[in-house]
Amino acid sequence: ESTEDEKAMQQMVERLFPEYASQFSFEQSEKIDKDWYEIEAQGGIVRIRGNNANSMAVGLNYYLNHYCLTSVSWYVNDTVEMPEVLPMPPAKITSTARCKNRFFLNYCTFGYTMPWWTWKDWERLIDWMALNGINMPLAITGQESVWYRVWTKLGLTDEEIRNYFTGPAHLPWHRMSNLDYWQGPLPKEWLDTQEALQKQIVARERQFNMRPILPAFAGHVPSELKRIYPEAKISRMSSWGGFEDKYRSHFLDPLDPLFATIQKEFLEEQTKLFGTDHIYGADPFNEVAPP
């Protein structure tokens, strides 16, 4: 019976070029200290072995690039141009990874076209990431749903929370504490759909042996928190990008006991929704001066 990694690879080729799927075979083999793959032609079948799905995907990409002279883009509507007859490698090809951790994406990427992506767009990007050996992707979609739960638990109202968030296109800069409120309030329906999307994203990334890097609390808080915690050491950040002062964000002193409380609440709520691989990203002072 096929392993989960072998199934993941077979499903990938069925998504990318279904008419050729039966001509590929994937075999998960014993692990060594490094990620590795092996490509070999056997009886008209391209056999790709590796220690996991991620490694086998890199092997598949090598075969596509060097033998089919084609490439897979991360845009779902781009077809993969394949030769009429699959070329068979004349000799066995083997390769091992040069580095263990292979990171991809940044905070701003999630504010260009990604706010409007559907699962089909993400599915293709994750295939592309696997083909290119990415195993530590930044995964920050849907975090507002986590924050909504945390801020509600701490006493903020629905209106206060959703007004504090920016509109979808500016959320990456809101997350990096550049601005608040701009083009809000964020609809509750949007929070819910992004939460569902993130569940699909991290599940598929883990299927390809990736460890999604989830967000952690970096000190950025709603100004309304001062209403509930008047003694908290909350400072105002510098202005950013020419926006009016009313959009400036607020920062909680990491030495304030409330900081650890919020961090714990956030990580616990996030883990309930999305699981964890125990790797987190935080970007507290992007293009703003620390208080």
List where the protein language model places each region.
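Bacterial Sec-dependent signal peptides at the C-terminal "C-region" and cleavage site
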Residues: 1-3
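Short Lys/Arg-enriched alpha/beta "domain-start" segment
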Residues: 5-9
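Auxiliary, metal-adjacent structural segments of Zn-dependent hydrolase domains
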Residues: 13-32, 84
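Aromatic-lined carbohydrate-binding surfaces of glycoside hydrolases
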Residues: 20, 28-33, 42-54, 58, ...
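Aromatic-residue-lined binding/catalytic grooves and analogous aromatic/hydrophobic interfacial grooves
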Residues: 66-67
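Glycine/proline-rich low-complexity spacer/linker segments in large multi-domain proteins
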Residues: 71-76
